[in-house]
């Protein structure tokens, strides 16, 4: 935990003196001009075995990792290792060996070698569950041609600009209802403001949003009484993420052999996710079959079924993955965004001014407004820089490549340390400052291969456009209706629970500009 009031960089520097180097210091001198590629050299590359490493005994490394309780601070470990070994290092934990890189030019070079069917690291307990219990898989786990076939279909329905336009009338009312929910809380507290930790409310908001987009129907997650079956799904997703971390470095064949409580809880969480997703999909599937006309966009499920480009089993698998991936990830990013806005009131006022100007110029047309808030969209990128959902981005290069003058064999797991990159002054000036304007710079070198919060390329997050729209609409309505402040001034640290989460509750203060919620 960081010392109260001590900025992240200061705390890290005190703990590990020059962990974060400046340009021209330490390994910062390795940087080359954009376009050359930091890992490209005319010299004969050095062998893979010479890449700096803490040692080749994976089990000893893993023992030390566990002894230091490193699993929940792995993102800080990356920073420490880059300072110790330079801009590239390899590490073996148990049976898993990875090469870690941080330089944006190395990242750009890596992606040139990802091939037509990019491969990411499969989270072992997730994959083990699907294999052991013979669950259908979607684009999260599919490879090669089967992945590409599904992904092309999904891109049309969830990533294309025309598809995104259909989501606006589904997502906008959910954000408006969240504003109404906060007004109810204000009246309940009776102090003219609401003070509290809204983490659970954000989970409900995210699930209400993703299910509305998937099925074209509301579940009522923002009502006074929450659907208990839907709450079970949310709780299961939370448990699935939190039980994943202790299992990451355990050989999957040991899961069923020892049947630890962590594995049993993990299985139970996935069982609930599949059972509830199957139930929702089947209910809405039968409902859609009975309808012949739709006044409004009927949701992604209907469009996938109508296109007949994907088998029903594949539709269900991909819907399940998008539902599971659309709760904790989006809600956590919004919580971090509110936290950063509450600590940077001048930035919050800049964002509010942009939103209010957009409202006036667009005459209330929300679709037009969305085209007029570049700073707000940049603020989401800035939140993901400081608080990325995933601490690394992974690829298995299709062929041999050279990074930092080292030869990386094909199919080596290469991990881009995006948390460490986002906190390094070699790549971001004043890295601990919440400054969305950095993403609007005309100097593209300043942001080249740095915006990696949703991944990159054809294998980026399939729900990216939904999440971006959902968060933008949410923030528009929050900024129009409330001033957001911290209840107590102080830093909140992050812990790794497969996604980065706060180490303590974040208590926010919502001060309404009007005592009554706006009329939808």
Task: Annotate each language-model stretch with its function.
Residues 35-69, 73-170, 174, 198, ...:
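Cytochrome P450 substrate-recognition site 1
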Residues 121-127, 131, 165-334, 350:
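Cytochrome P450 heme-thiolate monooxygenase catalytic core
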Residues 416-443:
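Conserved cytochrome P450 K-helix/beta-meander segment immediately N-terminal to the heme-binding cysteine loop
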Residues 1-46:
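N-terminal mitochondrial targeting presequence
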Residues 64-86, 275, 279, 363-404, ...:
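Conserved cytochrome P450 K-helix E-x-x-R motif and the immediately C-terminal K′/meander segment
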């Amino acid at each position: 935990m960081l010392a109260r009031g001590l900025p992240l960089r200061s705390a890290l520097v005190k703990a590990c003196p020059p962990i974060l180097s400046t340009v021209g210091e330490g390994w910062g001198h390795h940087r080359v001009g954009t376009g050359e590629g930091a890992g490209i050299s005319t010299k004969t590359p050095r062998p893979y075995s010479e890449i700096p490493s803490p040692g080749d005994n994976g089990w000893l490394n893993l023992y030390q990792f566990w002894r230091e309780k490193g699993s929940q601070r792995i993102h800080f470990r990356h920073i420490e290792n880059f300072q110790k070994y330079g801009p590239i290092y390899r590490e073996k934990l148990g049976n898993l060996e990875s090469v870690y890189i941080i330089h944006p030019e190395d990242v750009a070079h890596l992606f040139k070698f990802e091939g037509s069917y990019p491969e990411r690291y499969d989270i072992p307990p997730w994959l083990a569950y699907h294999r052991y219990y013979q669950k259908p898989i979607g684009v999260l786990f599919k490879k090669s041609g089967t992945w590409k076939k599904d992904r092309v279909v999904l891109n049309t329905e969830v990533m294309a600009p025309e598809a995104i336009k259909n989501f606006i009338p589904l997502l906008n009312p959910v954000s408006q209802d969240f504003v109404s929910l906060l007004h109810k809380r204000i009246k309940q507290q009776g102090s003219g403001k609401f003070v509290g930790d809204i983490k659970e409310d954000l989970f409900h908001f995210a699930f209400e949003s993703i299910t509305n987009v998937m099925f074209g129907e509301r579940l009522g997650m923002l009502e006074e009484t929450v659907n208990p079956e839907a709450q079970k799904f949310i709780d299961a997703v939370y448990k699935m993420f939190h039980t994943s971390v202790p299992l990451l470095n355990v050989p999957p064949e040991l899961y069923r052999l020892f049947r630890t409580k962590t594995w049993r809880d993990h299985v139970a969480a996935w069982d609930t996710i599949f059972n509830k997703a199957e139930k929702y999909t089947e209910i809405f599937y039968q409902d859609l079959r009975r309808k012949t006309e739709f006044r409004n966009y009927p949701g992604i499920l209907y469009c996938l079924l109508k296109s007949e480009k994907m088998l029903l089993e594949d539709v269900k698998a991909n819907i399940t993955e998008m539902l599971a991936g659309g709760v904790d990830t989006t809600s956590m990013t919004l919580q971090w965004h509110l936290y950063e806005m509450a600590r940077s009131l001048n930035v919050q006022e800049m964002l509010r001014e942009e939103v209010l100007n957009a409202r006036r110029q667009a005459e209330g047309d929300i679709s037009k407004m969305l085209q007029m808030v570049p700073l707000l969209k940049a603020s989401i990128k800035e939140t993901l820089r400081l608080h990325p959902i995933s601490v690394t981005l992974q690829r298995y290069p299709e062929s041999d490549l050279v990074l930092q003058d080292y030869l990386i064999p094909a199919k080596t797991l290469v991990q881009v340390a995006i948390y460490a990159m986002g906190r390094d002054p070699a790549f971001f000036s004043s890295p601990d400052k919440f400054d969305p304007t950095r993403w609007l710079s005309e100097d593209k070198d300043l942001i080249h291969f740095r915006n990696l919060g949703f991944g990159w390329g054809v294998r980026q997050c399939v729900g990216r456009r939904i999440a971006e729209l959902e968060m933008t609409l949410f923030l528009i309505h929050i900024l129009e209706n409330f001033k957001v402040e911290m209840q107590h001034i102080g830093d909140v640290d992050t812990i790794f629970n497969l996604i980065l989460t706060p180490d303590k509750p974040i208590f926010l203060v919502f001060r309404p500009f009007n005592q009554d919620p706006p009329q939808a």
